Regions:
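Mg2+-dependent prenyl diphosphate-binding active-site environment of isoprenoid biosynthetic enzymes
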Residues: 15-173
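Single conserved hydrophobic/aromatic residue that forms the stacking wall/gate
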Residues: 1-18
Length: 173
C-alpha cells in the first residue's frame, strides 16, 4: 500500500536500519489497532474489512477489543525496546509524539469527532480537522520519527510534521 511505502521511505532516511524497522512495525500496529476498533459495532459497525470478515465478526467483540488494545501497547513496547541504537532522550521524544498521534489530539480524538458528526451537518473545516486527526497525525509521526532519530534541526522537524499531516489528509480524500 502507499502508506507502507511512505512509512518505509521516511524511516529509511534515519541513520539506523533497526530503528526504522521498529518505527515501521509500531506504525503498522497502530494502524491495525485503529482499523479493528473502527469496525466495532459501537463505532462504524463494519462487518467486512478488505473483503473479509472484520475481527469482531470472526473472533467476537471482546477478542477484537483486546487485540486492538494489545496492538496499541505493542507499538509502544517496540519503540521502548532497549536493543537498538537510539539515544534515550530521542526515544522519549518519539514515544511522546506517538502517544500524541494516537490519543485525544490524534486518532482517538478524530474518531470521537467522526462519531459525534454522524447524521449532522458539519462544516468543511470541521471535517478537515477530523481527518487530520484520524490519519494526518499518524502520517505526521511517520515523517517526524526519522527526523528525531537523525537529529534534524527544529525547522526540519516542523517541516516533516507539516508534510506528514498533509499527506495523511490527502490520504482521506
Amino acid at each position: 500500500s502507499s502508506r507502507k511505502r511512505h512509512t518505509r521511505f521516511t524511516s529509511d532516511r534515519s541513520s539506523d536500519v533497526c530503528s526504522s524497522d521498529l518505527i515501521c512495525g509500531s506504525v503498522e500496529c497502530i494502524h491495525s489497532y485503529s482499523l479493528i476498533h473502527d469496525d466495532l459495532p459501537c463505532m462504524d459497525n463494519d462487518r467486512l474489512r478488505r473483503g473479509k470478515p472484520a475481527t469482531h465478526i470472526k473472533f467476537g467483540e471482546s477478542t477484537a477489543i483486546l487485540s486492538g488494545n494489545s496492538l496499541l501497547t505493542l507499538a509502544f513496547e517496540m519503540i521502548a525496546e532497549k536493543n537498538y541504537n537510539v539515544k534515550p532522550n530521542k526515544k522519549i521524544l518519539i514515544l511522546k509524539k506517538l502517544a500524541e498521534c494516537v490519543g485525544h489530539v490524534g486518532i482517538a480524538g478524530g474518531q470521537f469527532l467522526d462519531l459525534s458528526y454522524e447524521k449532522k451537518k458539519v462544516s468543511g473545516s470541521k471535517i478537515i480537522s477530523m481527518q487530520k486527526k484520524k490519519t494526518g497525525k499518524l502520517f505526521e509521526f511517520c515523517c517526524l520519527a526519522p527526523a528525531i532519530i537523525s537529529g534534524a534541526d527544529t525547522k526540519t522537524k516542523k517541516d516533516m510534521s507539516f508534510v506528514g499531516e498533509e499527506i495523511g489528509f490527502l490520504f482521506q480524500i
